[in-house]
Amino acid sequence: MVSTSNGSDPLTIGGRLFSCRLLTGTGKYPSINSMQSSIERSACEMVTVAVRRVQTGAAGHTGLMEAIDWSRIWMLPNTAGCTNAEEAIRVARLGRELAKLAGQEDNNFIKLEVIPDSRHLLPDPIGTLQAAEALVKEGFTVLPYINADPLLAQRLEEVGCATVMPLGSPIGSGQGLNNAANIALIIENATVPVVVDAGIGVPSEAAQAMEMGADAVLVNSAIALAGDPPSMAEAMGKAVIAGRMAYSSGRLPRRGQASASSPTTGLISGKDK
């Protein structure tokens, strides 16, 4: 199992502290056992659960609630499958009840997804903002999934969201950080944690997001659909730790020309022979 990140550098969301900055999902795994092992080896402390799929017993979600140790893992219910704000609000309420059934009575977290387009799976900015405003008023800790739109991120922060979760690229695409420039702007301006969500395909991309200054990443498809999900989960966990350490250490400034790493004084010249 990967050791979690430095305990002196916790991730704080909604007043709750997490020592691991990798969030994972529960969908698309080849088996429940594969999911369990992946969660364990990633060292993650928060996993997202699709409320609708658990409620309906969708493929891959039967027995999910019993398969995870909810005394150790914080549940992040999500509103996947919701196409408008009204649906998302209803499913968020069900998600809160689901967390209570898992023994997390004080869990008001919700990963807000409003996605009307089933082909491209891009989030609806207007519906997301509408649902976020309503859910914050109901006492939810809202983690909204959004396009990498700096202005929308700012507005969601203003209405009281606990994080913003810009996508790197479309869900499940494995295209990496196609929106790196906008994500960098969001990170620069945000006063809440920025969690890069969707599109990460390999550990180097998770590390890249962390090196940019993201507070965390959420990775599901890249782990669940890997040839060896538990090994990929461990690799992602290590990449997130490395990326965070690199960001905290401060990178070498970029220069327009070379700079010798060896001293240029005291060199032996031809005259010294």
UniProtKB/Swiss-Prot annotation:
Residues 258-267 have a biased composition (Polar residues). Belongs to the ThiG family. CDD domains: ThiG (cd04728). Transmembrane segments: none annotated. It holds the Pfam family ThiG. Homotetramer. Forms heterodimers with either ThiH or ThiS. Coiled coil: none annotated. Pathway: Cofactor biosynthesis; thiamine diphosphate biosynthesis. This is Thiazole synthase. SUPFAM superfamilies: ThiG-like. It is an enzyme of class 2 (transferase). It is found in: Cytoplasm. 1-deoxy-D-xylulose 5-phosphate binds at G172, A198, G199, N220, S221. GO terms for molecular function: thiazole synthase activity. HAMAP family: ThiG (MF_00443). GO terms for biological process: thiamine diphosphate biosynthetic process. The active site is at K111 (schiff-base intermediate with dxp). Catalyzes the rearrangement of 1-deoxy-D-xylulose 5-phosphate (DXP) to produce the thiazole phosphate moiety of thiamine. Sulfur is provided by the thiocarboxylate moiety of the carrier protein ThiS. In vitro, sulfur can be provided by H(2)S. GO terms for cellular component: cytoplasm.
